[in-house]
Amino acid sequence: MPAQVAVSAPYYSLGMAANRPPARARARPGSLERPINARLYRGTWLLVGIPLLIAAFSVGKPTALRAAVPTLPPAFDKARATALARDLAQTFPDRSPGSPGAVSARQWFADQVAKIGLRVRREPFTATIPGRGRIQLENLIVTIPGRSPQALAVLAHLDNIGTGPGANDNASGVAALIELARSYASVSGSPPPGASIVSPAHTLFFVATDGGEFGGLGADKFAADFRDRLVTAVALDSIAGHGTARLVIAGNTARQAAPGLVETTAARIQEQAGALPRRPSAFAQLLDLAFPFTLYEQGPVLTHGVGALTITTAGDRGPPPFADTPQRLNGGRLAQIGRSAQELLRALDQGAELVQGTSSYVYLGARVIRGWAIELVLIAALLPFIIAAVDLFARCRRRHLPIAPALRSYRSRLLFWLWVGLVFEVFALAGVWPTGAALPLSPHSSAAHHWPLLGLFGLGALAALGWIVTRSRLAPRRAVGIDEELAGHTAALLALGVVGLLVVATNPFALLIVLPSLHAWLWLPQVQSRPLWVRAAVYAAGFLGPVIVLISFAARYGLGLDAPWYLAELVAVRFVSIPVFVIGLTWLAVAGQLGALTVGRYAPYPSADERRLGPIRSALRAAVLAQRTRRRTVSDERQRAAGG
């Protein structure tokens, strides 16, 4: 019997060991270590399929307008236009706003227009240019009366940056403007050679704008004054370069010219140049909708609800000022685009109402995807994050995790960033930063490259003061449990969801910038127990959207390392609106809380028992106690003296 026991005992132990559940290699889904419902997150991505299908059915091919009646061959004179451009660039190399050369150049334009029997109407105005101050500017308008008061406009900025002759940018556009006006001079006087003998259906405005190099100040003023009459507008800028023609369709808002206007312009250029003009890539178009920005004059016109585009041979930034000499003008390209603009104007005169207005879209080859369909896809891409974040919050509530201290911790970080934003805005009002109209700054200007170090030092000092006050509530004082860390993640993700909804309310296309942070940072609670480098990689992925915007400005506009300051300047001049600025600060507060969790420096907002006096109250308490001590010492000395 003892032998049987000796045999059965090991057998029994082995059997129990065989039936024991295996140790888990990873945490159970739904636990504190793996709180994100990955299955729910993956499943909600199926919701994006329906908007994608709708977007596919929204793809269409816009059609171009053609002139309703036969027209004469284009009468644009290549030699005369090239001579005008060279004369303007050589005689007035400095046409920067407010300079004597700008005044003389305006008189030169008026004289050239007078030679073809037309008159110029002067429209003076003032504007503040960052780095230059308040300056007197003037638009020059040549009007060709039509059978309708509704108007078409051709714009070309007369000014330049002042550091080069500005032959291509934009003496070429001004020369083409004069040649285009010449072909309609018969309507207002004796026709010069090559002039049209047909009165236009629409009133025509040929506008030499001022301040075009500084955000399109003149175009903005003209569009504001004539928005009720304008049907559409075309800007000519740097059209005598050696590159092929290019269409700039982006605006300063998430609106573009109607696709029919773009197609009509492209068709007229193809007829004269033998090739279609270049357009931005699909990714660049999406980025321009997410962060609307352009240096060309169609931008402010589109802001006023008037369809407009720019024809150019330059890039996003324009030609380098020092190399923009009369000797480098391409007369052949100037003639091609000039004749294209002439035929475009005739086509628009017959049917501009069919291509007026603004819309949003993205070109894919010869076809376009409608903006509303893209917005629908982007909003649908927000849903997986929202649903997963709400599910995480519900799980935390069921576990009775301390969400309130985590929300208060986020509130403290948000107040810190709002303090930094308030100081920045106060400095802007005080003139510490260069200020001006709410338009893009010239990348060539000193304001775009000069960092006001003294002002930035003051901003940093006041920000540090705000952080010292805030840090007393955020510094870890004890070991933080995994439940408190999860609550901190949940509070930050809820705030991030609010940021996403606010972006939808302002500009749904801007979700392109925010979505990487939403979908990357959602998984930070899931990797909280992983090594630091894993957490840091997931955290860094959330900055992909803002980094792409920063790189885009640095590369496309030649800003390089000055791109961060340039973006800050856009905030200072209110090109970036206050609501968008506040949304950005809210996003930074989320990044701050998640960053603290990533590196293990997070602490929930302290309870009343844990709370210490802040630095200000501590200093006041120390001062009061010191004053009481001094008074007590003086009183004791007086009593001893009286007793002695």
State where each predicted segment sits:
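N-terminal Lys/Arg-rich, disordered targeting/topogenic segments
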Residues: A6-P35, V624-G643
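Short, Lys/Arg-rich N-terminal segment immediately upstream of the first membrane anchor
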Residues: A27-Y41, P405-Y410
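Hydrophobic membrane-insertion alpha-helices, especially the h-region
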Residues: R42-S58
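Soluble extramembrane regions of membrane proteins in the secretory/endomembrane system
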Residues: P62-Y361
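His/Asp/Glu-rich mid-to-C-terminal helical/loop segments that flank catalytic regions of hydrolases
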Residues: T313-I386, A572-V573, I578-V580, G584-P604
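Alpha-helical transmembrane segments of integral membrane proteins
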Residues: E375-G644
